[in-house]
């Protein structure tokens, strides 16, 4: 039986709350909070997050027919999982992901660390998080901003460092699971067409460029995202 698992990233609240619309649309789906996101200590690499997720799923009896969907860090974890354990993964639906280190300005990382120490910088960071989520409906946006307050900028810094170390260019050709890529074309944080690179590297993959969506398509345009995932699931069943 197919088990859908949604994996969050450091943005859109930095926790599983960003998948509230999908958890409603797919009643038996799962969306764990990764370590260090509200509780515990963050992991130091995508590989460690992947092993944590696998243990979390196996403890609940989910070890095959997994449909893994994630954005940013969560997308990296999903892709790593599918490469490491291909017999357990049925399909992937990924957003805002690169198969190689992203080009990020050093000051963008320092900004998160400074926000953890300086109240004025912290407020600027919160304002930035609020601005990035401008496509999200107001009530949910406020809820996710509160989650950002709880998770904090230092945890986000750690996640960005982990993302920027992720590199599977030498393994991407071994991917067996059907792959759906969804890219928000109005992403204010985009520094390259990374999804297109993966699409070209994985024969048979599907790339959707979603209008009026930015960094978090699943929460910015939930109806469009859910429809795209529904169609993808119907194609692989």
Predicted region positions:
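Conserved alpha/beta-hydrolase catalytic His-Asp/Glu region
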Residues: 103-105, 120-173
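Short beta-strand/loop motif that positions the catalytic acidic residue
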Residues: 175, 181-183, 187
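Catalytic histidine-centered segment of alpha/beta-hydrolase-like enzymes
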Residues: 41, 210-226
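Conserved alpha/beta-hydrolase "acid-adjacent" motif
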Residues: 188-194
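Conserved HGGG/HGGXW glycine-rich cap/lid loop of the alpha/beta-hydrolase fold
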Residues: 1-41
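Conserved acidic catalytic loop of the alpha/beta-hydrolase fold
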Residues: 48-65
């Amino acid at each position: 039986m197919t088990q859908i698992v949604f994996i969050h990233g450091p943005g859109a609240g930095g926790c599983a709350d960003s998948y509230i619309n999908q958890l409603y649309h797919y009643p038996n789906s799962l969306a764990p909070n990764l370590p260090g996101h509200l509780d515990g200590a963050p992991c130091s690499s995508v590989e460690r997050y992947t092993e944590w997720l696998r243990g979390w799923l196996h403890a609940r009896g989910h070890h095959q027919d997994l449909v893994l969907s994630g954005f940013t860090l969560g997308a990296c974890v999903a892709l790593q999982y599918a490469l490491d354990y291909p017999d357990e993964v049925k399909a992937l639906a990924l957003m805002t992901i690169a198969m190689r280190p992203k080009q990020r300005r050093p000051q963008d990382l320092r900004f998160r660390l400074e926000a953890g120490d300086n109240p004025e910088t912290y407020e600027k960071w919160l304002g930035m998080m609020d601005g990035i989520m401008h496509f999200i409906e107001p009530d949910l946006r406020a809820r996710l901003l509160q989650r950002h307050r709880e998770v904090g900028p230092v945890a986000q810094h750690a996640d960005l460092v982990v993302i920027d170390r992720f590199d599977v260019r030498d393994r991407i050709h071994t991917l067996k699971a059907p792959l759906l890529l969804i890219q928000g074309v109005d992403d204010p944080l985009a520094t390259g067409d990374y999804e297109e690179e993966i699409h070209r590297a994985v024969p048979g993959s599907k790339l959707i460029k979603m209008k009026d969506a930015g960094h978090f398509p699943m929460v910015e345009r939930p109806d469009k995202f859910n429809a795209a995932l529904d169609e993808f699931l119907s194609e692989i069943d």
